[in-house]
Amino acid sequence: MGGVFLLLSKISFYGTTLILIVLILVLSLKFNKKTENKIIEEVSNEYMASYFDGEYQTEIPGKNDGYVVDKIVCDNGAVGEWDNEEWGINIRNATQKIKCSVYFKKALTILGKVIEDESQIATNDPDNNIRYVGAEPNNYVYFNCSNYSNQNDSTCEKWRIIGEFNNITKADGTKENLTKIIRNDSLGNFSWDYKQNGVGTSISTYGSNDWTDSQLMMMLNTTDYLKSGYTIENSVVKDSNSQAIYQNMGSYYNGASGCKPASITSGSSFSCTSIDFTSTGLQNDLTRNAIESVVWNLGGANEYNSSVNGLASHWYGYERGITIYSGHATTWIGKIGLMYPSDYGYATSGSSMQNRTLCLSKELYNWNSIADCYNNDYLYNSNLNQWTLTSSSTSAYNIMNVYALGNVLSTFSYYSNYSVRPTLYLKSSISISKGDGSSSNPYQLKLN
């Protein structure tokens, strides 16, 4: 007989029912194919069948082989529960001859960590990306640490893992699956852009919604990502006509003093309103080198106020499309961006009253009327109006926002009372070393 051994661990009575709990330890397996296309191993009065992704196999996967148990089906009233630590099965109510089938499936992982509670994730966006969902999923991660050898609330910031995204195009043109994270707390309130008519890409008094030369982009990113044709003279950023646009580009990225996005008119000099990022900006090169430079999609939206054009799935398509205001860029290469409207929409878990499917069938424009959708979304904050990266394609200056009321609307890019939550992709070489992702025990990263 093949080597499956039952180690008796407990026998006890509850009422008149005998509860027999046994642990099956798999040392080696020699299965026999049955007529019902199952693989069965008999040991005494117990039988066990093994399936990987719905197909029977001749062995059970090892603990570190990248599989998790999908379900266990036992007959004759027995109940099987999988012990992930011991990598074995606990069987209850084994009062007679039983057969248990154990179904394994490929584990979902983020940063090398197997997601054991799959109720906290979803994979149903158009590209089957793995996303965390819910009001408070275990997706906290320490990042931007002053000391990665001693990661805690004092040495690190808390960020949230949005998810793992498939086939992200990197700056060198290659594609990888990369993990996107967002700062848990707002960096502060800033204008998205406040360039006036004739300055850079602006053609209005309300700023420009072209991210490639927005003042917010310049505040967050290093000079490596300055728009082609633009120059820097004595720390002043100038457009292709040598008009001043901004000053001290990259202050957040470099953890230095810089300037807030501010009004600048054609023919005038930029007047810096100082902002100090020495404590809230990126702290060191370990952090900076952990961020992947990628292609960010800048597609915009036209109509989005109904269920035929404003669902999270529609936004996902708009963001990756080429519909933008005339002359504006459809993509941008850089490190620090913002969340998308679709990130917000897909992060909901819904509730027992209004489940996720129903939330995703409702336009984000009207989510303010569905508390079960936005209250069960960790990207929502009732105290913040949050900038996104996505623009209006019919306007040269409107940007989409996640409002404190829970819906997604557009507003002028020059407004200064909207919150910024830096968002970025981690390099694929980075993994989780410890932690459980809760707010009290965030994941800790191993930076290579």
Q: Where is each model-derived feature located?
A:
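Short, Lys/Arg-enriched N-terminal segments with co-localized hydrophobic residues
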Residues: 1-6
